[in-house]
Amino acid sequence: FTDWNQSVVNEKVYTVALVGIAVISWLMIRWSDDPDGPKADRILVLVAYLSSLGYGVHMAGMLAAPAVAVAVLVRRPRTLLRWRLLLAIAGALVLGLTPFATQPIRAAYNPPIDEGEPTACRNGLHLSCTFSSGTYDAFMYNFNRGQYGKPALDQRQAPFTGQIGMWWYYFKWQWMRDPFNQNPAMQSILAAVFFVLGAFGAWVHFQRERRSFWYFGTYMFTTTLLLIYYLNFKYGATQPVTGDVAREVRDRDYFFLWSFSAWGVWAALGLVFIWESVASFFGTERTKLGKDLITLPTDQALKFGSPILLIAIIPLFTNWQWAPRSGQTDTRDFAHDLLDSVEPYGVLVTVGDNDTFPLWYAQEVEGIRRDVIDANTSLLNTDWYGRQLLRRPVYDYDEAKGPAVYRGKQWEKPKGPPLNMSLSDIDAIPEAEQLPNRMAFDAGGLHAILDPDSLEEGYLQRADILVLRMIKDAWPARPVYFSRTSGDYPSRTLGLAKYLIEQGLASKVIMPPAKPTPDTVWMPPNPFRGEGEWMDVQRSKELWLHDFTAPASLIRRGSWIDEPSKGIPYLYVITGGDLIGALRTVHDTADAQHAFATMMGVAHMIRMDGPGVIPPLNSGFWEQGMLAGPPPAVAATRGDSAHGPKSSDTRAGVVLHDTGPKKRPPARPGR
């Protein structure tokens, strides 16, 4: 059982890899029964092929390899001395890895989604660049997962005991998922029962079928203690740990499904052992097994003892409520809503997986709002994503399929990408640039202050430079938006606080209005919203009430059990609250009531509607401090007159103006 159920990766990757391991395990048990049989060598060659083929699906495809080696060493070590068999196994391993060869070939054709870009070819597939050191280096970087930068194994990200505790925490989920901690005692009891059953099963396996135990026992060791040590995870995202500790961004329970599934086999053996033991009280008989006579329960006795087998179906009932996903369209609907929050041909800046991968699916599979460019800041920090933005074609906006609020207007199709740069210009952008002091960024009348104290150790990241460059090159002719999932990134990191207006689930870069309008409301900071900003009341109302589809699907879903991804439904609570306050400020009470009911439905789904959590509609909280017009102007100083005019600094085509000396911390070591 896993609750990472907003991702089809579970079915398309982990489950497929698990099927491969299951087939390998079945083959090795057959081989262990008859290692000198006529098909024994063929089985080993097939196992080698399936292992490397499974590696192409997921690295876990090789998890059975140590167990295969131990089984061969224990059962028939002389097998390792037969060079023809070893050559056949080596050939099978290479053959199974050949699907990897498609990666640089595919990448050379610049597909819409090409993570890692494992090729040195920049203008199509050619032999000279495909068979080059550049392609080899790019491919091996992907193959070895270099982008993740895991520390050395002797640098533990959490104590090994804590990492084992993470395994146990997720082990308990398999027998009874208790997402809201309502029955912790029962969950622990069931986990203990199935743990003991598995331990009994391991003992029974060792006693009765030692030939296959060497394979299965080694596999279990590999997928538990050895894998836990190798993965070297931080504490789990929701693992109960006291104190402020480093945690994974999501619960990594799916990395241990290999051991959980295998433990289920041992638990089944243990349950059968208990069934036979109980049945023996109702009658036994002597049965010949090979040359030996053994005592077994009679058929009638087994029937009397069979109710004990009902233990096996307990997890089916305890997890049924949380496991099915039929009718869950909220992830797709969220992508639809976020894309529709952006005007035609807009650039949407996102920050992570949850606000990017659903958008890719919606655009590339369902063809939803392909005119919008999704610029992910995490990926913009890589050396390849910027090139993909340059190559991405400008897709036509389909007015008939777009929101009604955009119809009847002329939307000029851009002639090129949002970056006025060449591929070599993109490649020349540094990984990071240190700001010596406060700098001003100017573009199309916009004047933003970049403060080193608001940057990571005073450095402007590659992604920050590219986002500023997109504003400089494309805005205001092309709309630029920041997803509301980006938090205070545009306001704090890029200094754009007063240049943002909320429209649906995104904030658009604008020139702040000079006078009040009926549709423009200033929203001050509050505990739900965080930073203050403008709201386009009419646009947000039309999107919320007539276009958004996720609130209804979230309410229909009924509950949200994955705590780390709760930010998606929570986003609807935040933006709903903003809209409610704005509508009440402009005295649109009927629509405010409608929006409040929808927001409370989503809040109930994530259990955020308890007493005192969300203020009542008529409490005055939502419209508190809102102004139907601009807030007091805040002067943005362009220079310190006491020091005279300041110099300009050009960084990757982004002109920054020095606003005055400011003491900085010493430069950090090379990145």
Q: How would you label these PLM feature ranges?
A:
Residues 1-7:
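Short intrinsically disordered, low-complexity coil segments enriched in acidic
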Residues 3, 20-23, 226:
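Transmembrane-helix signature of multi-pass solute transporters
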Residues 8-18, 30-47, 51-252, 256-345, ...:
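ER/secretory pathway lumenal C-terminal domains and tails of membrane proteins involved
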Residues 26:
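Short, small/polar-rich loop/turn modules that mediate ligand/substrate recognition or access, typified
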Residues 353:
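Acidic-and-aromatic substrate-binding clefts and catalytic sites of carbohydrate-active enzymes
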Residues 659-671:
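Short Lys/Arg-rich cationic patches that frequently serve as NLS/NoLS or arginine-rich RNA/DNA-binding motifs
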